[in-house]
Curated annotation (Swiss-Prot):
Keyword Transport (UniProt): yes
Membrane-traversing stretches: none
Protein name as it appears in the record: Movement protein
Main location as per UniProt: host cell
Length: 283
């Protein structure tokens, strides 16, 4: 999920007469690539022991600088009413575990403002997820628009902060977090109704029950079992039949078909071998 919009909506959002430059900044292949590589937009971020705290700004530094310069130049020229604001209606995070449910650990995920040195959760937009609760969906909704300014050496914007706690003995990846959002930029700003951070626990996917038809593995196993049963049945049955046959059945060998009414046919009907009291006789 990348930035979306048209030149018309960008013009309305920025109150600018021309938006070609802003559109290029936001939607160029380079800008979209930076959103993915620097901000993990729509990508899976692995939480490891050597990366126990992750801070992901929602706008890359280079893109932030170019957008801020665009609004500042318009503001200085008297064409725009401000130096620009960043608006994010919602941030959605999909969280899944990559270890057993027995692992003792948790994740603390929250929305922060890089203008705050302490990186405290803004508006209580913070959620704690225990390992055994996963998978889950988390949503954040900030109540204000963030000014596109530089504070000290930090480019001010919203950021997703993820903290890993516990997981003693697990040095590798214990959880995967995939975040999506859509940032908007305008020369106007507003305040919004406070909505608590959302946490929705999701039932794990039952991949066996969801199959409408037998899976390839199930079909293979069934076919293999059928083959084994069939071969065992044929061999066993043949052996049992051979042992169970009477002496008369063993001697009753089929002869080629003979025309009805012929002398051979009459002889065939007359002389039939039988066993009577252990003695072979012809009748």
């Amino acid at each position: 999920m990348a930035f979306q919009g048209t030149s018309r909506t960008l013009t309305q959002q920025s109150s600018a007469a021309t938006s070609d430059e802003l559109q290029k900044i936001l939607f160029s292949p380079e800008a979209i690539k930076k959103m993915a590589t620097e901000c993990d937009l729509g990508r899976h971020h692995w939480m490891r022991a050597d990366n126990a705290i992750s801070v992901r700004p929602l706008v890359p530094e280079v893109t932030h600088g170019r957008i801020a310069s665009f609004f500042k130049s318009g503001y200085d020229a008297g064409e725009l009413s401000s130096k620009g604001y960043m608006s994010v209606p919602q941030v959605l995070c999909a969280v899944t575990r990559t270890v057993s449910t027995d692992a003792e650990g948790s994740l603390r995920i929250y929305l922060a403002d890089l203008g705050d040195k302490e990186l405290s959760p803004i508006d209580g937009q913070c959620v704690t997820l225990h390992n055994h609760d996963l998978p889950a969906l988390v949503s954040f909704q900030p109540t204000y628009d963030c000014p596109m300014e530089t504070v000290g050496n930090r480019k001010r914007c919203f950021a997703v902060v993820i903290e890993r706690h516990g997981y003693i003995g697990y040095t590798g990846t214990t959880a995967s977090v995939c975040s999506n959002w859509q940032a908007r930029f305008s020369s106007k700003n507003n305040n919004y109704t406070h909505i608590a951070a959302g946490k929705t626990l999701v039932l794990p996917f039952n991949r066996l029950a969801e199959q409408t038809k037998p899976s390839a593995v199930a079909r293979l196993l069934k076919s293999q079992l059928n083959n084994i049963e069939s071969s065992q049945y044929v061999l066993t049955n043949a052996k049992i039949n051979q042992n169970a046959r009477s002496e008369s059945e063993e001697l009753n060998v089929e002869s080629p078909p003979i025309a009805i009414g012929s002398s051979s046919a009459s002889r065939s009907e007359t002389f039939r071998p039988q066993v009577v009291n252990g003695t072979l006789v012809f009748s």
